[in-house]
């Protein structure tokens, strides 16, 4: 039997998930699977009648996690479950949905095919980041999409000295600096004019946000390297800066703080129905197939 124990995870603040999650749980039970419901999902979405489990129990027990929500919901679940090796499948109940690639209306059919063994699996890298103040590590977190250094809301540009494996790259003055995985290359990085990286690539991309010097362009680096970024005390950095991990966890920064980013030791496995294509997702989400049309009311 494929995936005998399935965990259900939903977007916490979405009160409209009760019916679709309950229907999904019933479908899984009828298919002979044991269903677990993540604790916060059960509490906030109102799903009842099934065993409730915390993240640790899901990680130790589940053979598949079904995540219903937007990409942000999947990112949070992935960070929790990656160390356990539990594969994820995403059902889109959000907006764009690059990694929640199954539309809600197709969820039962798609999941049924997956349970029959008709699926594709892919492993994607994560980033591991740390904040150092002198020799003391102040903060550590992982990220599926990106690690982002940002100026404070009313502050000036930040200045960051960037090194890769001890070799000096540049000193960057900008509103921010994005370090993205291939998965994250279609998120914040893309909106800052970063390149799209195929998820099978072993790489990271550095993308400046509104750099002072226009010649400071995105650069792709191997994922085997260790990035060291030091926030300098020049300019108006003292007003405030922070580092964000998938825009869900963060740490405030001070001048002189050092941020390290490298590939995490574990990966996250995504499960897709048979026939999934990364390029098909790009065509749908980015409307690559839409051609400009002539109109009669051109201005």
From Swiss-Prot:
One of its GO terms (biological process) is NADP biosynthetic process. Gene3D superfamilies: Probable inorganic polyphosphate/atp-NAD kinase, domain 1, Probable inorganic polyphosphate/atp-NAD kinase, domain 2. Keywords: ATP-binding, Cytoplasm, Kinase, NAD, NADP, Nucleotide-binding, Transferase. GO terms for cellular component: cytoplasm. Pfam families: NAD_kinase, NAD_kinase_C. Its cofactor is a divalent metal cation. Its EC number is 2.7.1.23. It catalyses: NAD(+) + ATP = ADP + NADP(+) + H(+). Signal peptide: none annotated. NAD(+) binds at residues 71-72, 145-146, 173, 175, 186-191, 210, 248. The keyword Magnesium does not apply. InterPro entries: ATP-NAD_kinase_N, ATP-NAD_kinase_PpnK-typ_C, NAD/diacylglycerol_kinase_sf, NADK. The active site is at 71 (proton acceptor). Belongs to the NAD kinase family. Involved in the regulation of the intracellular balance of NAD and NADP, and is a key enzyme in the biosynthesis of NADP. Catalyzes specifically the phosphorylation on 2'-hydroxyl of the adenosine moiety of NAD to yield NADP. NCBIfam families: PRK02155.1. This is NAD kinase. It comes from Bordetella parapertussis (strain 12822 / ATCC BAA-587 / NCTC 13253).
């Amino acid at each position: 039997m494929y995936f005998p124990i399935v965990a259900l995870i939903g977007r916490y603040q979405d009160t409209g998930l009760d019916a679709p999650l309950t229907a999904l749980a019933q479908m899984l039970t009828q298919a002979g699977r044991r269903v677990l419901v993540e604790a916060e999902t059960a509490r906030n979405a109102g799903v009842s009648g099934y065993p409730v489990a915390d993240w640790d129990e899901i990680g130790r027990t589940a053979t598949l996690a079904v995540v219903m929500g937007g990409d942000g919901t999947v990112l949070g679940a992935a960070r929790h479950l990656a160390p356990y090796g539990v594969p994820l499948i995403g059902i889109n109940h959000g907006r764009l949905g690059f990694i929640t690639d199954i539309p809600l209306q197709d969820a039962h059919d798609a999941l049924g095919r997956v349970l029959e063994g008709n699926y594709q699996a892919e492993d994607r890298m994560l980033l591991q980041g740390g904040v150092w103040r002198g020799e003391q590590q102040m903060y550590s977190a992982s990220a599926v999409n990106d690690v982002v250094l940002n100026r404070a809301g009313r502050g000036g540009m930040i200045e960051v000295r960037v090194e890769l494996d001890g070799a000096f790259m540049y000193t960057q003055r900008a509103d921010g600096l994005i370090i993205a995985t291939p998965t994250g290359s279609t998120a914040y990085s893309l909106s800052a004019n970063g390149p799209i990286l195929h998820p099978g690539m072993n790489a990271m991309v550095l993308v400046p946000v509104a750099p002072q010097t226009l010649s400071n362009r995105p650069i792709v680096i191997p994922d085997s390297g260790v990035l060291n970024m030091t926030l300098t005390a020049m300019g108006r950095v003292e007003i405030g800066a922070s580092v964000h991990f998938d825009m869900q966890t963060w740490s405030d920064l001070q001048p002189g703080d050092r941020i390290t980013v490298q590939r995490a030791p574990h990966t996250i496995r995504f499960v897709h129905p048979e026939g999934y294509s990364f390029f098909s997702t790009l065509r749908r989400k980015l409307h690559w197939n839409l051609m400009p049309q002539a109109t009669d009311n051109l201005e």
